[in-house]
């Protein structure tokens, strides 16, 4: 009976609940866990639902985030579900990437319709690259008028479309988290329908091994008689011995061939995403490469200096700055393994940014970094983290 738990054959998908505070995200999360436990008791653990709301603190890049993780399974998939209870926690979580979501359930109370935070969360989901949203119209048991429900649904679909999601096709499921928790069969079925929609509509994530190879360089050294070795943790993709690679960032792009791959002093034929390894590079001297560059599949990523970003600035209590900053502020931007100085330009109409704020900004780095949309970074001042952000678009 218990064997099903250890099946590693199912796709693993990370999802989350997003939406306005008090629209019932946490109650719905609890309802999903309970309904799936009752439906597939051999696949799911029973949980105490108070434990979802008392979210443990997590630290990501020096930022404290209250966030709770729940695991559950349907017949098709294994899910890790993240619920960030507070609005500020949700924003920090999205920007630091503390929980990368493959898809999200936008929770909208049928009694209220989309509110200011609903909009903000959808916008942020688009900016940080959440690939898929569907909608749980929660508290639907409290609305008797079918036409009113249709109206709210239309409004939510328009909101999704306005932010670049598929508002026409996204499933909108009418649910009641509270009634499902209480065991009301009509509403239990609504939560089952919601999870069936998640199974069907959130695409299987492309796992990191299927993407083009990328390894940030952490260290460079020379092995006498063999050449230059760079070490680091492969971020994505796979790399076979004798492959051509490019070294990108900080300096002009260099091409070379990987003539050896080592892990813990053992020779390997291939390096895989997630592994710490050393790569022996043909024809390069120790001074040709440095920490902060990346080893990549040729043509898969390009170096850039100017970009737009969405940034969270730490509050004083979180160990951040004590005072605001203005345009032309010059901190360090920590990408993957290195700091690069950059100059900040604030958007028109924003005169200054206070500690604890979430803001858009344009950044010009003094050296190019291998960059793509969605890449996370920390903002540092004298080695301590004062903010965290994501690249939303590349300028040059």
From Swiss-Prot:
Record-listed E.C. numbers: 3.6.5.3
Every tr-type G domain range: 10-206
Positions bound to GTP: 19-26, 83-87, 138-141
Binding site for Mg(2+): 26
Residue segments, region G4: 138-141
Enzyme kind, highest EC tier: hydrolase
Ranges where the record places region G1: 19-26
A Gene Ontology molecular function term of the record: GTP binding
Region annotation G2: where it falls in the sequence: 62-66
Described function: GTP hydrolase that promotes the GTP-dependent binding of aminoacyl-tRNA to the A-site of ribosomes during protein biosynthesis.
Subunit structure: Monomer.
The protein's name in its UniProt record: Elongation factor Tu
Organism of derivation: Paenarthrobacter aurescens (strain TC1)
Gene encoding the protein: tuf
């Amino acid at each position: 009976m218990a064997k099903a738990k250890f099946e590693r054959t199912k796709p693993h998908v990370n999802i989350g609940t997003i939406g306005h505070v008090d629209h019932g995200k946490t109650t719905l999360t609890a309802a999903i866990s309970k309904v799936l436990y009752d439906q597939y008791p051999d696949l799911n653990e029973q949980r105490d639902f108070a434990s979802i709301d008392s979210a443990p603190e997590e630290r990501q890049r020096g930022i404290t985030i209250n966030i709770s993780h729940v695991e559950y399974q349907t017949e098709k998939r294994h899910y890790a579900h993240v619920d960030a209870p507070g609005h500020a926690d949700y924003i920090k979580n999205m920007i630091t990437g503390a929980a990368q979501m493959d898809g999200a359930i936008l929770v909208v109370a049928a009694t209220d319709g989309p509110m200011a935070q609903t909009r903000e969360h959808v916008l942020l989901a688009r900016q940080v690259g959440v690939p898929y949203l569907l909608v749980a119209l929660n508290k639907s048991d409290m609305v008797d008028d079918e036409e009113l429900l249709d109206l709210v649904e239309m409004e939510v679909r328009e909101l999704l479309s306005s932010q670049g999601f598929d508002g026409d096709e996204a499933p909108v499921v009418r649910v009641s988290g509270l009634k499902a928790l209480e065991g009301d069969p009509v509403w239990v079925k609504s939560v089952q329908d919601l999870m069936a929609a998640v199974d069907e509509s959130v695409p299987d994530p492309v796992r990191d091994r299927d993407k083009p190879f990328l390894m940030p360089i952490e260290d460079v050294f020379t092995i006498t008689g063999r050449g230059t070795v760079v070490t680091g943790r492969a971020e994505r993709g796979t790399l076979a011995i004798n492959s051509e690679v490019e070294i990108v960032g900080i300096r002009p792009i260099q091409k070379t061939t990987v003539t050896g791959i080592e892990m813990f002093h053992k020779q390997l034929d291939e390096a895989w995403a997630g592994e710490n390894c050393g790569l022996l590079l043909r024809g390069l001297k120790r001074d040709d490469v440095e920490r902060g560059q990346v080893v990549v599949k040729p043509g898969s990523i390009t170096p850039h200096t100017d970009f737009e970003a969405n940034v969270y600035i730490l509050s004083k209590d979180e160990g951040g700055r004590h005072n605001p900053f203005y345009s032309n502020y010059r901190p360090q931007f920590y990408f993957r393994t290195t700091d690069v100085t950059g100059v900040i330009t604030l958007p028109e109409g924003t005169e200054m940014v206070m500690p604890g704020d979430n803001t858009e900004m344009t950044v010009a780095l003094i050296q190019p970094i291998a960059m793509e949309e969605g890449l996370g970074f920390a903002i540092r001042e004298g080695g301590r983290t004062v903010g965290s952000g994501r690249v939303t678009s590349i300028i040059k």
